[in-house]
């Protein structure tokens, strides 16, 4: 149990039958009346954000999230397949539950599979990946006045906007959280 007065960003709590991560909190002490804690909570399962107010003495149970390193094996029509590298157990996750989390991840790369009480709810890809550009338009001289970008398709099939000097077969570094080009490798 954690009291609202001890809330910090990143803490996961169970509240009203759901699991939430605290993304913002503020201790408020008005001139008149009792103090309170104003929070923004992100629902771990649905991704929705709600605002809730707690009394500082109010207690909530903490939610223990298991993040397990697993190897992304392959995808078929409906599922992504992962393997636990310690026990070699395999799990299948429906594509609609995983969403776009794996659009920059190649087969056989490591990911973190997040679960709560045995129920898998998310896959966290590595923060940065290095991928080969499979298709992009050539950049032309004189196009660089405003730091222009062009679309490029990488080996996983995802599209990234890259600077004009990036060419086909270049290896680039991508931030998987934002989908942005970081550098050429």
Curated annotation (Swiss-Prot):
Annotated GO biological processes are:
peptide biosynthetic process
The protein's matches in HAMAP family, at most eight in alphabetical order, are given as: EF_P
Q: In which pathway does it act?
A: Protein biosynthesis; polypeptide chain elongation
Q: Which named protein is this?
A: Elongation factor P
Where in the cell is the protein located?
Cytoplasm
CDD domains from the UniProt entry: S1_EF-P_repeat_1 (cd04470), S1_EF-P_repeat_2 (cd05794)
One molecular function GO term is: translation elongation factor activity
Which Pfam families does the record cross-reference, listed alphabetically? EFP, EFP_N, Elong-fact-P_C
Instruction: Tell me the NCBIfam families matching this sequence.
Output: efp (TIGR00038), PRK00529.1 (NF001810)
Q: Which Gene3D superfamilies match?
A: 2.30.30.30, Nucleic acid-binding proteins
Query: Which species is listed as the source?
Result: Agathobacter rectalis (strain ATCC 33656 / DSM 3377 / JCM 17463 / KCTC 5835 / VPI 0990)
Any one cellular-component term (Gene Ontology)? cytoplasm
Q: What InterPro entries does UniProt report for this protein, alphabetically?
A: Elong-fact-P_C, NA-bd_OB-fold, Rib_uL2_dom2, Transl_elong_fac_P/YeiP, Transl_elong_KOW-like, Transl_elong_P/YeiP_cen, Transl_elong_P/YeiP_CS, Transl_elongation_fac_P
What task does this protein carry out? Involved in peptide bond synthesis. Stimulates efficient translation and peptide-bond synthesis on native or reconstituted 70S ribosomes in vitro. Probably functions indirectly by altering the affinity of the ribosome for aminoacyl-tRNA, thus increasing their reactivity as acceptors for peptidyl transferase.
């Amino acid at each position: 149990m954690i009291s609202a007065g001890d809330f910090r960003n990143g803490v996961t709590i169970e509240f009203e039958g759901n699991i939430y991560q605290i993304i913002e909190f503020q201790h408020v002490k008005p001139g008149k009346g009792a103090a309170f804690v104003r929070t923004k909570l992100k629902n771990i399962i649905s991704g929705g954000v709600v605002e809730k107010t707690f009394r500082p003495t109010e207690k909530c149970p903490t939610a223990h999230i298991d993040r397990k390193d697993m190897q992304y094996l392959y995808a078929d029509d409906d599922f992504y397949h992962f393997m636990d590298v310690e026990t070699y157990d395999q799990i299948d996750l429906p594509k609609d539950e995983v969403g776009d989390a794996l659009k920059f991840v190649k087969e056989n790369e490591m990911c973190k599979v997040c679960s709560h009480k045995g129920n898998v709810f998310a896959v966290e890809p590595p923060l940065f990946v290095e991928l080969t550009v499979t298709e992009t338009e050539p950049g032309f001289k004189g196009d660089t006045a405003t730091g222009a970008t062009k679309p490029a398709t990488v080996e996983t099939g995802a599209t990234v906007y890259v600077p004009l000097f990036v060419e086909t077969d270049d290896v680039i570094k991508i931030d998987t959280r934002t989908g942005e080009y970081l550098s050429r490798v």
